[in-house]
Amino acid sequence: MKFVALALTLLLALGSQANLFQADAPTQLEHYKAAALVYLNQVKDQAEKALDNLDGTDYEQYKLQLSESLTKLQEYAQTTSQALTPYAETISTQLMENTKQLRERVMTDVEDLRSKLEPHRAELYTALQKHIDEYREKLEPVFQEYSALNRQNAEQLRAKLEPLMDDIRKAFESNIEETKSKVVPMVEAVRTKLTERLEDLRTMAAPYAEEYKEQLVKAVEEAREKIAPHTQDLQTRMEPYMENVRTTFAQMYETIAKAIQA
């Protein structure tokens, strides 16, 4: 309706300036008036299409009143536009006076129709909100129960596994130390035995040191070279065993730790 009032205002303004436009550019004046009338026709057509979408007997009277008001408004605008040029000021005033009540009636009908439709829109929104709230009330306890059960199960599993993890960690450390305590003495014993044999050999060779110094030194070095590989071989053979034990316990610990965190 604001656009309808704008079109009427344009017609009035063009009418009040008719003499000036006729003196300067009469074709431009006619173009503006024709455009305003075309716009009023479009407004009437669009309003009638909108009214057709209102169903029910409650709105029939409003549809009829509003349609009649738009038709009369269009007729007034058409008649006044044709008479504006020779009688600009008189017809402009007459148009405003003659259409005042009609324009007020149109605005009243539109506001009345809006007030009739507003409760239905509010009722629809209220009904939808009610259904949403009902669904939320029904689903929320289920979600809460499911979430609580998951948390409870996770806490129970964690409570059961934590002592087990501590035992495994302690057992792992204990097994490593136990294995080391058994293997290291064996290596040390072999090393001690070999060292003793070398010392015995050196003691036995001492009296002949000066006489057979060069030969004895050479013999001792040869003996050392022969014994050293056996010592290194023993250590090499034991190292994979130690590493295998360490890797096995580490993998076991990591697997259980991941299961708890999951």
Curated annotation (Swiss-Prot):
One of its GO terms (biological process) is cholesterol metabolic process. Residues 64-262 are annotated as: 10 X approximate tandem repeats. Keywords: Cholesterol metabolism, HDL, Lipid metabolism, Lipid transport, Repeat, Secreted, Signal, Steroid metabolism, Sterol metabolism, Transport. GO terms for cellular component: chylomicron; extracellular region; extracellular vesicle; high-density lipoprotein particle; low-density lipoprotein particle; very-low-density lipoprotein particle. Residues 32-63 are annotated as: 3 X approximate tandem repeats. GO terms for molecular function: cholesterol transfer activity; phosphatidylcholine-sterol O-acyltransferase activator activity; phospholipid binding; protein homodimerization activity. It is found in: Secreted. Residues 1-18 form the signal peptide. It comes from the Eukaryota. Pfam families: Apolipoprotein (PF01442). The keyword Transferase does not apply. InterPro entries: ApoA_E, Apolipoprotein_A1/A4/E. Its main location: secreted. Sequence repeats lie at residues 64-85, 87-107, 108-118, 119-140, 141-162, 163-184, 185-206, 207-228, 229-239, 240-262. Participates in the reverse transport of cholesterol from tissues to the liver for excretion by promoting cholesterol efflux from tissues and by acting as a cofactor for the lecithin cholesterol acyltransferase (LCAT). PANTHER family: APOLIPOPROTEIN, APOLIPOPROTEIN A-I. Homodimer. Interacts with naxe and yjefn3. Belongs to the apolipoprotein A1/A4/E family. This is Apolipoprotein A-Ia. The lineage of its organism: Eukaryota, Metazoa, Chordata, Craniata, Vertebrata. The gene is apoa1a.
